[in-house]
Amino acid sequence: MSIDKIGAFTEILAQDSGNAFARYGLAIEYTQRGETALAMEQFDTLQQLHPDYTAGYQMAAQALMASGNTQQAEERLRAGIECARRTGNQHALAEMTGMLEELANPDA
């Protein structure tokens, strides 16, 4: 039996539109299905409602990188780095700093 994760997350959000975990999960599901525009809508909403949800910035940047939107990915990483610094999330800070360096030096 296959679980319709998009349906499940959508149902949760219909009951609680501010549920950060469900919003993030829905964005990830859309990303995994290659539906970048829908994923970015969810990541954007997540970041508007929960600006300190650091993982959202990193995963949004990864989705943008995978779809070839490197400039937007860079912008999302810079916002995520600021968020990681603000929240003291050193692991996310290191990960996103590394991703940003890879974008700046793709041949390195």
What are these regions (language model features)?
Residues E11-I12, T45-L46, G80:
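Canonical positions in the second alpha-helix
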Residues Q15, Q48-L49, C83-T87:
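Structural marker of alpha-solenoid helical repeat scaffolds
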